[in-house]
Amino acid sequence: MRNTAFILACSATVLLAQEPNPLAQTPSPVAAAASANPLYRVDVVARTTPAVNYGHRTLPTRIDFAGAVFQPDAQGEAVVESKRGVVHIDAKWKNLASPQRYGANYLAYVLWAVTPEGRAQNLGEISPDSGQKAKLETSTQLQTFALIVTAEPYYSVTQPSNVVVLENKLRPDTVGRVQTVDAKYELLPRGRHSLDLEAVRAHDEQRSGKHSGKRVSRKEYESLVGLYQARNAVQFAEHAGAAEHAATTLQKAKTLLDRAERQYAASPKSATVVTLAREATQTAEDARLITLRRRSSPAPDQAAAL
């Protein structure tokens, strides 16, 4: 028996009740170097993104992804199925340009499930291939959520940035009855987003063959992106004050990053580089979150590093 699928309108303009995205609270680690580049300011207005109640034991259903203001030509689709309380998502996208076209800080795309209450869950990194296509199979225990894709400084962020690239869109054949209700919350903060036009232009010229840069293999490219994400994560953690509030965790992240750097120098295509870099990224994000929580909830033993 088919469960009813309800649509809850998620208005895209209020802060989520989670730790802020690193880009929302700290300056870009490379901002000084990029300050001379022309910036294009984009005002993102409120809009509605549907959240679907997939329920329990529903039949597989399909949803589409539509490109948002930053990349309107991007598109995708997903098959969503609930099994024993776990919702499985098999998604694919096309016309998904590299996140680096938005600036040096954007190194990853992340798929998010966002509940009507505003809680966001990172469902995994999306890695476009040379043909601007990507796939991701993932799952969540959330039952009612919207799906969005954002550009991020690294894969392990715990709060979406404002750079929403894609958002889910209902299809005519979506399983179940659709009901739209008024939401009393908003999904993402309204804000002004700076696009680095020089980065966009350089990226697009490189894809069109107008820019002559060093070409590397796919494996080496993955190693480099992993290292850059880890460096970003460490810098954001340091800027948040992790050296004082989460010194041990931050040092662990730095040690992992150093091992990844040395492994890359010895063997750029080694899978170990990506493994170490991703562990460094996650550990650095842990240090940043520990720092934010300790700063917001002072305690007598707060000065002691984790």
Regions found by a protein language model. Name each.
Residues 37-85, 175-190:
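Transition segment at domain starts
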Residues 151-160:
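Short acidic/polar inter-strand loop motif in beta-rich domains
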Residues 90-93, 98, 124, 130-140:
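Exposed aromatic-hydrophobic patches
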Residues 269-306:
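Long, amphipathic alpha-helical segments that form or neighbor coiled-coils/leucine zippers used
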Residues 102-109:
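Short coil-to-beta strand junction motifs in C2/discoidin
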Residues 195-257, 299-306:
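Amphipathic, heptad-repeat alpha-helical segments
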Residues 239-279, 283:
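Amphipathic, non-membrane alpha-helical rod segments
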Residues 4-15:
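Bacterial N-terminal signal peptides
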